[in-house]
């Protein structure tokens, strides 16, 4: 389903959902404000409802404003590209984290983040400037961060070896999380079970499930979405999510979410298929993780 009320004739992709419910705020990257040039992070909202009487599923979406997200947008957006928003709550220190992929003046992509405690009594956090995730930084393009369910391991995309691949690194639990993120660069490891000889990008983890995009052979065309399950200490061989999700065009930067009262999860992703409003649009679909993971 095309989220047409938050899409535009420009490119809208790289979304993230900070909270779950039947009214879901969604942060995503769009180049509409620069008429197709630079990408910035903006905010929308999705509504969905399942009528248990007649079995009808209703989906709607629109642009939205939110005081906290407006503060975040004002802090991070600039004349270069901001992509790949990713929200994280760290229960170990009680702080929220907003990660994103930032284009530098030189054109390379870097990972940056904001860190804050939950706003109290309507008082919004103040940010001087985003911090560089320097522990993952390199002279290549680094972006699209995600963490496993225990925040014990971080995964991200980089082209430091040529093609884009998915890298991983263990999180040092012995030091403050912010200090670890801002620490000196360390070597990340290629995940052999996830990567191919082609481009593998934009990982997103929900519980023990990972979705990502790849242009490896055997797909439906362009970039397709792939799925992997973490079991017995390792990720399974990825498999294509099939024609209900993928097309001969490009499917990109997926995320998985969940809403109370629904049996299935949902997946939101970007695609440049021709039935959209123009460029890349955001799409929504239901997904049964257990059934998908048992294929």
Predicted regions and their residues:
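Short, conserved micro-motifs composed of acidic
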Residues: 1-295
């Amino acid at each position: 389903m095309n989220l047409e009320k938050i899409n535009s004739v420009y490119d809208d992709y790289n979304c993230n959902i900070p909270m779950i419910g039947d009214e879901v705020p969604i942060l995503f990257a769009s180049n509409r404000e620069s008429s197709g040039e630079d990408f910035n992070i903006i905010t929308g909202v999705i509504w969905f409802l399942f009528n248990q009487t007649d079995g009808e599923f209703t989906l709607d979406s629109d642009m939205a404003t939110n005081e906290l997200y407006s503060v975040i947008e004002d802090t991070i957006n600039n004349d270069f590209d901001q992509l790949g928003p990713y929200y994280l709550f760290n229960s170990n220190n009680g702080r929220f984290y907003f990660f994103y992929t930032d284009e530098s003046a030189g054109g390379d992509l870097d990972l940056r983040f904001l860190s804050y405690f939950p706003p109290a009594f309507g008082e919004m956090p103040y940010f001087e400037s985003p911090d560089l995730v320097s522990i993952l930084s390199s002279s290549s393009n680094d972006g699209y961060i995600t963490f496993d369910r225990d925040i014990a391991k971080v995964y991200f995309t980089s082209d430091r070896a040529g093609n884009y691949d998915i890298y991983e690194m263990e999180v040092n639990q012995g030091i403050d999380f912010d200090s670890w993120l801002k620490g000196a660069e360390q070597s990340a490891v290629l995940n052999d079970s996830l990567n191919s000889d082609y481009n593998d990008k934009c990982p997103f983890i929900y519980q023990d499930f990972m979705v990502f995009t790849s242009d490896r052979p055997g797909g439906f065309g362009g970039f397709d979405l792939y799925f992997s399950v973490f079991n017995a200490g390792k990720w399974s061989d990825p498999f294509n999510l099939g024609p209900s999700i993928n097309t001969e065009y490009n499917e990109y930067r997926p995320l998985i979410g969940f809403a109370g009262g629904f049996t299935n999860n949902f997946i939101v992703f970007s695609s440049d298929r021709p039935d959209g409003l123009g460029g890349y649009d955001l799409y929504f679909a239901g997904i049964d993780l257990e059934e998908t993971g048992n294929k």
